C-alpha cells in the first residue's frame, strides 16, 4: 500500500500544482516535499516541465524535469531529488552535479551509474548538443569547476568545435576566456543559432553583460528574430555598418546582411568588406565553387544595390584578376539589383518571405547564367 505522500506525488504527475492555497498549507506541503521555488510543486506530464504555484509550462522560470533534478542536487534537497527521479528524471545528470559525498551516494542508490563520471561525460555533452538542451547543459557545466577541470584542455576545445566557433565566442573578450565563460557562450550561441526562444530569454535575463555579444552573434548567424527583439524591444543598439561587417563574415548570410542594410548599413561598404576579405584569402586558392558561401554574400550585396564598379573595388579587382569571383565582377552588367529587395522590411517573418522569394526567383537561374558566362 502506498503512503499518502507517495500517492500525492504520483497524482501531481497528472495534475498541475494548485495556485490557491491557505497560508497554513505551506508547512504541510513542505513536510510532504511538495514545495518548490516558493510555491506548491507541480509537473506537466505532457511538457515534462516542473512548475510552481500559478506558473505555466511556457514561463521562462519553469524547469524541464532534468533541470529541476540538477537544481535539487546542487542544493542537496534529498526529498526533491527522490521526487524528480520518481517522475522520470535522469539521475545520471544528478551525479555529475553532486557536491557532497552524501548526495552522490543517494544518486547511486537511485540508479546512477558510478562509472558515469569517468566514461559518460563526453557522450553526454554530444547528446545535449544534438538534443539542443541548452539550459540543462548550462545548469550542469556552468560553475561546475570539478567537471570542467576533468576535461583535458585540448579535448575540451576540440569537444566544443573550437575552430568553427572561436571567432564569435571570443568576440568582446579582452583576455583569454576561462572554460566557464567558454561553456556559457558556446551554449548561448547554440540557442541563438537555432532560435531557441526560451533559452535565449532565460540567458538574456541571467547574463545581461552579454547583451551586445548576443546581438553581434545574432547578426553573425542571421537570426533576424533575435536582432529585432534586441534592437527594438530591448533597445540594444550597435552601429549598422559594424553589424554589417559581422553579417558579411558568415557564409550565405542573406538574412543578416539584408537586416543590417534595412537598419541603415552602407551596402557599398559591405561589398568592399567582402572584396577585401576575398583579397586577403585569395592566396589560399579560393575558387567560385569552393567558396560558394562568401560569393553568395557578394552576389547578394549587388542584388541589394551595391556598385561593384567603384574605383576602390576595381583597384582591388585589378590586383586579383586571376580569381574567378573577380573575373565575374569585371563583366559589367552581368550582376544587377533585384527588384524584390527594394522593399525595406523589418518584421522578421516578412523578411524571411522576401529572402525566400529572392532565392526562388534569382539564385538558381543566376548561378546557371554565371556558369555559362565563364565558358
Curated annotation (Swiss-Prot):
InterPro entries in UniProt: ASFV_MGF360 (IPR002595)
Family in the record: Belongs to the asfivirus MGF 360 family.
GO terms under biological process: taxis
Record's function text: Plays a role in virus cell tropism, and may be required for efficient virus replication in macrophages.
Biological classification of the source: Viruses, Varidnaviria, Bamfordvirae, Nucleocytoviricota, Pokkesviricetes
Native source species: African swine fever virus (isolate Portugal/Lis 57/1957) (ASFV)
Protein name: Protein MGF 360-5L
A Pfam family reported for this protein in Swiss-Prot or TrEMBL: ASFV_360
